[in-house]
Structure formats: structure tokens, C-alpha cells
Amino acid sequence: MELWFTEKQTKHFGITARINRTLHTEQTEFQKLDMVETEEFGNMLILDGMVMTTEKDEFVYHEMVAHVPLFTHPNPENVLVVGGGDGGVIREVLKHPSVKKATLVEIDGKVIEYSKKYLPSIAGALDHERVEVKVGDGFLHIAESENEYDVIMVDSTEPVGPAVNLFTKGFYAGISKALKEDGIFVAQTDNPWFTPELITNVVKDVKEIFPITRLYTANIPTYPSGLWTFTIGSKKYDPLEVSEDRFHDIETKYYTKELHKASFALPKFVGDLIK
């Protein structure tokens, strides 16, 4: 008998994947966590019925969250990742030699535990000497920080459950306070097909706080619609004005210096959302 997992991305649309076996399942303090082995995408992390990452396509999301802001900032030394318990963003952050410390604040320690066990190629960097892992509320961590970070990356789930506070104007204001005077932040902001209002609202809120606010995209097969957006807010540096000598060689599968700028070229219907 074949076993299939289906994520209902809207009431009337979803994606499905053939499952070889279930590796782990439990209701944590915060959410339903499932780790499964799929036929097509390798091991897959699912939270509250939503695909968070897979071994096959994880590099797209993690590279685009990390490298766009880190190449935009001329000397990022202290980096904060809110969420991201699978460790993929941290792995990419550590590819930048200027980064002296990377802090991960993940509310659900079980995500970290089982990512290390079943997604070692993604989570392996969490034990690096430059990394500090904190299990706790990222919203509260931001509120308690001031003038501390060069770059903050918000690697959250959808705006439901424990992540709901990470999509508010108050949170973005807190991020601005936690950043240094030339700091940059980036957040995943879902897709323009099914959640256009979210993108419009987030960009509007961020624009009221950060003088440079831009939206960029990436193609991620297992995420709703496949077209994913990220919002970047910067106090000083424009991601579209990065000099050529800023780009140093790192090993990537998706991100390139050409794609860095190209990712900000938006389809018209997406650009219309943020006019």
C-alpha cells in the first residue's frame, strides 16, 4: 500500500508527496512535528501539516535568506537568526568569514533535536564554535536587545501559532532597535498567489521603519505556489547597489552574484502588491 502526504495550501489546492516511512511524529509544546522520508525530496520536516524543509530543495530558501543581506552589508560580524531550528540558515551564515558570532533563537527545541537527527546535512552547523543556540521566544529576545546585531534574519513558519507575533509592526520596530545603526534585516514573507495581503501589509509596515525596503523572490518547489518572497529592510545599505568587489567566493547551489540583483526584478503582479 502506498502512503502519501498532502499539504493543503489553501482550502482548494495543495501538494502531495509519496512517503516511504515516518521517521518521527509528536505534538510538541508548540506544534505538531512530523519528520518523514519521501520518495522524491528525501527527508522532510513538517510542522502543523506544512512543509518546512526537505533535503532536496532546502538550499534555495536557506541561501536566499542568508546571502542577500550578508553580501549587502560590508562587514557583518554579529548575526541573529530568529526561528530556523533546522539549522540551514546558520549553515549558510557561517560561509561568511567576517561573521564572528551567529545566534539562533528557536522557540521549539524539538525542531532542533530532530533536525540534528534526521537532517544532518542541514543542521550540522548548529554545533559550530561560532554559533550560540538559544531555545526561547525570538520576539522576547528581540525586545531585550538593543544596538547589538549587524544582520537579523527571521526564518519563521507561517504567521500562525508561535510565529504570529513575528509578522507585526511592533516586531519590526523591535528589530530596528536591536540592529546597529547600519543594520539589515530580512524575513520570509510567503507567496503572492495565496497570501498577497500579507506581502502588502509586511512591506508597508517595514517601509515605515526602514529607509530602504525591498522585496525579492526565489523558486522553491515544495513551498506554496513555488514562488516565495522575502522582505529586506536596511538602515543604510541598498541590496541593489552592492559593488562587485563585495562578492567573495562561497559554495552555493542557487545563489549567485548575478541572481542577487536579478531576484529583485519582480513580476508585475507582485510589484503591484507593494506600490
UniProtKB/Swiss-Prot annotation:
Its main location: cytoplasm. It is found in: Cytoplasm. The keyword Cytoplasm applies. The active site is at 155 (proton acceptor). InterPro entries: PABS, PABS_CS, SAM-dependent_MTases_sf, Spermi_synthase, Spermidine_synt_N, Spermidine_synt_N_sf. S-methyl-5'-thioadenosine binds at residues 31, 106, 137-138, 162. Its EC number is 2.5.1.16. GO terms for cellular component: cytosol. Homodimer or homotetramer. Belongs to the spermidine/spermine synthase family. Catalyzes the irreversible transfer of a propylamine group from the amino donor S-adenosylmethioninamine (decarboxy-AdoMet) to putrescine (1,4-diaminobutane) to yield spermidine. This is Polyamine aminopropyltransferase. The gene is speE.
